[in-house]
A protein has these predicted regions:
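Core catalytic DNA strand-manipulation module of type IA topoisomerases
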Residues: 1-173
Length: 173
């Protein structure tokens, strides 16, 4: 018997594994489910904005910075060249108001993030919407998508931990 372990992290990986197992004989030895919490990510720095825009929107670094520059020049976001993950008191308070309005008090958890990078350029605060009340903007499709990414990340950074369940199944084949 092979005691190899297969770690399945996504729904897609689980479906692929189940498809590969079709027709096989197996026994479910054990199933355990336990609660887990996930802390929201910090607000965007230049680097994390570029990474997330590439991952979620397919934008290159140059595209991201060009679009962010337009958003900044239009007054929609704070300065986009920063290593800081800090938010102003205004941003924290208005994020709290938005979360309460959309989801209720229990989802609010104001946080203060610390920049861990040695020698970080923190003259500016984290990249965030200039006015948190503006959930969307007028602009090109690309500008709207990048703004939405920034707005959601800023709001998420001030929310309570996500409460999830982790399920582990032991299957012998």
């Amino acid at each position: 018997m092979d005691d190899s372990v297969i770690l399945v992290k996504t729904k897609e990986e689980a479906k692929a594994f189940l498809n590969a197992c079709q027709g096989a004989t197996f026994t479910i030895e054990d199933i355990t489910t336990r609660p887990v919490k996930k802390t929201p990510p910090a607000p965007f720095t230049t680097s994390t904005l570029q990474q997330e825009a590439a991952r979620k929107l397919g934008y290159t670094v140059a595209q991201t910075m060009m679009i962010a520059q337009r958003l900044y020049e239009s007054g929609f976001i704070t300065y986009m060249r920063t290593d800081s993950v800090n938010l102003s008191e205004y941003a924290t308070a208005s994020s709290k108001d938005a979360i309460i309005h959309m989801m209720g008090e229990r989802y609010v958890h104001p946080r203060h993030f610390e920049t861990k990078t040695k020698g970080a350029q923190e003259a500016h605060e984290a990249i965030r919407p200039t006015y948190m009340e503006n959930q969307s903007i007028d602009g090109t499709a690309q500008e709207k998508k990048l703004y939405d990414l920034i707005w959601k990340r800023t709001i998420a950074s001030q929310m309570a931990d996500a409460e999830l369940e982790k399920t582990t199944a032991t299957i012998s084949i």
